[in-house]
């Protein structure tokens, strides 16, 4: 009789553990989909940002200014290319990790969980470094640098700056989502 009560209690505890595990997997899947959407949006927003404008350049004070058609694109700055690449890599990794975790629903080994944890950690570092690089160059374009006589670029290419700017908080949010995923991954490890 006493054993029946213990078995019944263990059965309820196991059911509760399964529910918690399912809800944790649901949270993880939701966060991974969010990371996928954020990284894809950030890479796309920055990748398609472009503005062409006619800029007047005065070479010699005695001559009239020269009108030159100039284009601003993210691909012209290595920091922006790095940020786009970081987001594209994180997006691809997220899609692969979602597929792997969906395929191995009930059979997640410790090695798989450790690999996902390490992958998520790499994505955190990659996305934060991409945000930092693009933010530094973006700030330089917005404010210029009087010490080295670099002019403000956003004064001339305002549309480009306004189109590219949203990719920075999107990348930052994706990095934060990956940080939460790292915490979830660490909790899952026994």
Swiss-Prot record:
Topology in membrane: Multi-pass membrane protein
InterPro entries: CASP/CASPL, CASP_dom, CASPL
Domain of life (superkingdom): Eukaryota
Keywords from the UniProt entry: Cell membrane, Membrane, Transmembrane, Transmembrane helix
Transmembrane segments: 29-49, 84-104, 112-132, 164-184
Ranges of compositional bias, category Basic and acidic residues: 13-24
Residue intervals on the Extracellular side: 50-83, 133-163
Presence of keyword Repeat: no
Annotated Low complexity bias: 1-12
Cytoplasmic side: 1-28, 105-111, 185-190
Compartment list: Cell membrane
Span list, region Disordered: 1-24
Annotated GO CC locations: plasma membrane
Pfam families (alphabetical): CASP_dom
Family: Belongs to the Casparian strip membrane proteins (CASP) family.
Listed NCBIfam families: A_tha_TIGR01569
PANTHER family: CASP-LIKE PROTEIN 1U1
Subunit structure: Homodimer and heterodimers.
Protein name per its UniProtKB record: CASP-like protein 1E2
Species this chain originates from: Arabidopsis lyrata subsp. lyrata
